Each structure stands twice: as structure tokens, then as C-alpha cells.
Amino acid sequence: KDIGLFRTSGPRHLAFAGITAYSLYKWYDNHRYCSHCGNRLVRHDKERMLYCEKCNNTEYPKIMTAVIIAVTNGNKILLSKYANREYTRYALLAGFTEIGESVEETVKREVMEEVGLHVKNLRYYKSQPWSFSDTL
């Protein structure tokens, strides 16, 4: 099931619909039983949610928050080259938000961990869903 073709197929709204549908398919397929009591989960008919008729547990798709960071100094931008990874090109700094951490704290921690710099003048640019890895 190679869904990578959605990255380059168009029009974009159809590609987005295909990626979203595949992500939901994976989620429904991987969440069949209640994590509390083991009973079979039921799909809700009005929202993207599964529920347990036995213990009333509800489950929603989980989205992992991630950040991509452009560290700049004037007209210069800091790129990183990850060691010991399959991806060998230069890239912006990035990482996942940990439990109890704000997105701003994630940015500061990731920059410190990856390149040892303190972040100043933090500015938000925009968000983008990334359904291939269930991240935002």
C-alpha cells in the first residue's frame, strides 16, 4: 500500500482527501478493541470516534504534535545533517512535543538538544497536517 503517490498527485484537495481517508482507515483497523475492558469498539455515526458499549470508553484518533524549526540569523538559516540516519541530506531542525510540554517549549528544547543554541524571538509561522505519520 504505497500512499506516497498522494504527495505528488493532484488536484491537491483530492490528494488530501485520499491521505486523510488512508489515515482513518489505518486508525480504525488498529483500534478494534477497548483499551479498558477488551470489548469490541463501535464506530460513532456522527464523529470520528470509537466507543465501547460495555464500559462507555471513547477513543479518538491521536495526533502527535511535531515542530519543524527554522533557526535564522539575518539572511542565514541553520540546517542540520542527521548522523546515523537513512536521510542524509541537510534539513531544518525538528522534533516531537513531549507530554506536558507546549509547542514553544518543544522548539526551545529541540534547538538546544540538536545544536546547543538558546532560542530568542520565537515566531510561529503556520501548521500543516502530516497524515503519513499522524502528526501536526
What are these regions (language model features)?
Residues S102-V103:
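N-terminal phosphate-binding loop and adjacent alpha-helix
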Residues I99, G116-L136:
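Active-site segment of metal-dependent pyrophosphate-handling enzymes
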Residues G18-V67:
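Acidic, metal-coordinating catalytic segment for phosphate/diphosphate chemistry
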